[in-house]
Amino acid sequence: MSKNYHIAVLPGDGIGPEVMTQALKVLDAVRNRFAMRITTSHYDVGGAAIDNHGQPLPPATVEGCEQADAVLFGSVGGPKWEHLPPDQQPERGALLPLRKHFKLFSNLRPAKLYQGLEAFCPLRADIAANGFDILCVRELTGGIYFGQPKGREGSGQYEKAFDTEVYHRFEIERIARIAFESARKRRHKVTSIDKANVLQSSILWREIVNEIATEYPDVELTHMYIDNATMQLIKDPSQFDVLLCSNLFGDILSDECAMITGSMGMLPSASLNEQGFGLYEPAGGSAPDIAGKNIANPIAQILSLALLLRYSLDADDAASAIERAINRALEEGIRTGDLARGAAAVSTDEMGDIIARYVAEGV
């Protein structure tokens, strides 16, 4: 008998609700085709929660997420709530506390250049023609963003500011294992990014990654300095499979990977804890300027569902079915407005219907 799963659905603001609707259409197709027992519950978050409950992350939303196997998150924020104090605004008051509450230490950001979308890639045509499919695995809770001491002191010419890069062994070990396990589901290659020619924290990082690599003899490990990595991503992104990064370096490289795909509407994201619980969301924002117009690209939200199935529900077949359906739609020239470039475009609803149908048909 198949296991029962429960997903907490947090549509949020802007285009969040309408692209979430498309992801749930696809989830219905997955349920039917793979006979999976998956239930969902909806909760307010972000600006919608401020409007309805007076706070961006109500206790009922947190409790609902605690009772779920995973969280499918839409997007939060918009000009309507920008006048509020920073810690009460949708982004800082909802998403960051959720990450902290559930101890989400790893961030996974796939960046893929799909066949037929090479013209959107800002790289030279001969480089884009090779395509790329990269997974950036970023450590989220350690490093220079959280290390102590940090601050400012002194005055005049002696005024200074300082931050501290700190990594503990356990932090490096667990993020490295995420990267190696992910590589086993892909092309069996990990490139670990550091600055071990200068930084003590990077020397430790490299040593521990080498140790963890012995547990994965089927995965090829290479090391690369961060400055070289930023260059190699522009020169030949097809050489990479999984990038393993510290918090700071991952912050930089994940955005670079996103940019070279040419469309934020295609990029999902996953944040995981040690138990496999995850929060899955599009990498883009709430796009309030196009909200409610039925023109937003829902693919990032649908791909976020695929990540959820793969990493939190261990349903790789279902995740792959979604990815194949998206590939088929794009190969057939089906585009939302952000990808149409003057050609005929389908609506948000139509794109969701097409992908759901392809999942059901098993393309």
Swiss-Prot record:
Gene3D superfamilies reported in the protein's UniProt record: Isopropylmalate Dehydrogenase
UniProt keyword Oxidoreductase, yes or no: yes
InterPro entries: IsoCit/isopropylmalate_DH_CS, IsoPropMal-DH-like_dom, Isopropylmalate_DH
Pathway: Amino-acid biosynthesis; L-leucine biosynthesis; L-leucine from 3-methyl-2-oxobutanoate: step 3/4
Site (Important for catalysis) location in chain: 145, 195
Coiled coil: none
EC main group: oxidoreductase
UniProt xrefs under Pfam families: Iso_dh
UniProt key word Manganese: yes
Compartments (UniProt record): Cytoplasm
Annotated signal sequence range: none
UniProt cross-references to PROSITE patterns, sorted A to Z: IDH_IMDH (PS00470)
GO terms (BP aspect): L-leucine biosynthetic process
Cofactor note: Binds 1 Mg(2+) or Mn(2+) ion per subunit.
Binding sites annotated in the UniProt record for substrate: 99, 109, 138, 227
Family the UniProt entry places it in: Belongs to the isocitrate and isopropylmalate dehydrogenases family. LeuB type 1 subfamily.
Protein name: 3-isopropylmalate dehydrogenase
Gene: leuB
